[in-house]
Amino acid sequence: MSGMRAVRLLAVVALGMALVACAARPPFTVVKVTLSDFKYSSKVIEIPAGQKVGFEMTNVGTTEHDVMIHMGGFHYLIQPGATVRRNVGPLPAGEYQVQCTIPGHKELGMSATLVVR
């Protein structure tokens, strides 16, 4: 009988630890951005402040493009047909400019605004 009680107690402790581990994780948002010739899938990208964010960026165009967010350190070149995933944050509230830095692409419309609130 004591062996069965030990198994039950172990199961309850394991379940409790699993619930605590799930509850301890901070919120996480995934933002999907599609790059094409010559635009991003959205002109305004909104994300919550104070949370880590995962960006999934897919280039469906025929030309290489990049994504640079004017917040320091976020600049990724993405080849045609490729997907790049990167995590950032948490970010402070504000507006950040997003653009393709390949010459002429921003002027053709490859820019957006990242709004963090």
PLM region spans:
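Beta-strand-rich interaction surfaces with strong enrichment in secreted/lumenal proteins
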Residues: 42-45, 73-77, 86-88
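Asparagine-centered strand-capping/turn motif at beta-strand->loop junctions
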Residues: 57-59
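Extracellular/periplasmic metallocenter environments
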Residues: 80-117
